[in-house]
């Protein structure tokens, strides 16, 4: 097997999947930081963000990782990050005040592009559309409604989202239903010929639901673990060619329970049809991504799983804990990030 990157800490974990060996190469570890935001621009450039004001960047595929200070925000929790290049990135500080910052010079300077001082405000995740202009940020309920704001200029300015006047506002939820800021992946902006622009959002808590936040055309209960403060959906990814999505979650307080933690979604004429995998992931999972129409990766505090059949069966390849996994938007590199300042690269055969 080829070695694509230099191992910074000299630590590689070898795993087997379908008779083939994978490697999880730990690139960074040991800091008192929990990474939950991760954005991989290409095979060379990625950014990550997390607790205690942590922002890091690599421009050489992880050979070196630069810790970038954000003056005045050293104690903030940056739960999500969206990067556009080695120089441009947007970070989200979750709560009171909720703040979004943008850099265009590789983190030398940060500009505040959004702030909300509303009591109880808690931002959960961001997503950016393929045009790199349209963006959305979502947050927990304020006065009975999930918070959502949009940007049409690549995050330079934001305004609160309002639903179409003729449709029911699917943002209305009980106080016991919200979103999990576990990996910045509970929201997905898509644009499909069959059903136009949609904003797929998953929730948890007392109810786990899949919502179309933009068009307000569905607000469906998910056949997955729910009912408690630590249960529900955490992450969604969508594959356009197959018109399908995969949702993962479970119970982060009981992270080894391997049931009711994954839902497969097939969209028929714009409406979701749910099914469960034959073999689910092996515990609570906070993030899921498609590599292609058939291959997916999911991770959480109790391990990493891979599927090669569209999410129907999952194989545990590691019990290592990670919060988030992302693939290069342009390229093939796959990186993971999690607690204790851990950043790793997953190398597939």
Give each language-model segment a name.
Residues 1-23:
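Bacterial Sec-dependent N-terminal signal peptides
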Residues 22-349:
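Residue-level hotspots at or immediately adjacent to binding/recognition sites across diverse folds
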């Amino acid at each position: 097997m080829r070695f694509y990157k230099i191992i910074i800490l000299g630590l590689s974990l070898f795993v087997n999947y379908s008779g083939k060996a994978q490697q999880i190469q730990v690139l960074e570890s040991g800091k008192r930081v929990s990474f939950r935001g991760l954005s991989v621009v290409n095979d060379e450039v990625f950014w990550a963000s997390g607790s205690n004001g942590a922002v890091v960047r690599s421009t050489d595929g992880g050979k070196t990782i630069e810790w970038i200070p954000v003056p005045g925000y050293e104690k903030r929790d940056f739960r999500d990050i969206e990067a556009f290049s080695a120089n441009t990135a947007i970070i989200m500080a979750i709560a009171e005040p909720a703040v979004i910052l943008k850099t265009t010079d590789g983190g030398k300077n940060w500009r505040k592009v959004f702030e909300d001082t509303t009591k109880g405000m808690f931002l959960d995740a961001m997503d950016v559309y393929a045009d790199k202009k349209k963006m959305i940020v979502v947050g927990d309920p304020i006065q009975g409604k999930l918070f959502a704001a949009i940007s049409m200029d690549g995050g330079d300015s934001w305004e609160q989202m309002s639903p179409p006047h003729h449709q029911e506002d699917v943002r209305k939820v009980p106080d016991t239903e919200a979103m999990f800021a576990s990996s910045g992946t509970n929201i997905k902006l898509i644009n499909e010929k069959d059903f136009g622009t949609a904003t797929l959002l998953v929730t948890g808590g007392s109810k786990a639901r899949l919502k179309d936040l933009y068009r307000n055309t569905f607000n469906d209960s998910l056949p997955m673990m729910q009912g408690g403060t630590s249960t529900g959906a955490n992450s969604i990814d969508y594959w356009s060619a197959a018109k399908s999505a995969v949702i993962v979650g479970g119970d982060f307080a009981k992270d080894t329970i391997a049931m009711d933690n994954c839902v497969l979604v097939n969209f028929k004429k714009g409406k979701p049809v749910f099914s469960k995998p034959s073999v689910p992931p092996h515990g609570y999972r906070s993030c899921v991504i498609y590599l292609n129409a058939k291959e997916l990766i999911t991770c959480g505090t109790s391990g990493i799983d891979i599927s090669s059949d569209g999410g129907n069966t999952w194989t545990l390849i590691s019990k290592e804990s990670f919060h988030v996994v992302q693939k290069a938007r342009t390229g093939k590199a796959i990186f993971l990030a999690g607690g204790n300042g851990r950043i790793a690269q997953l190398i597939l055969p």
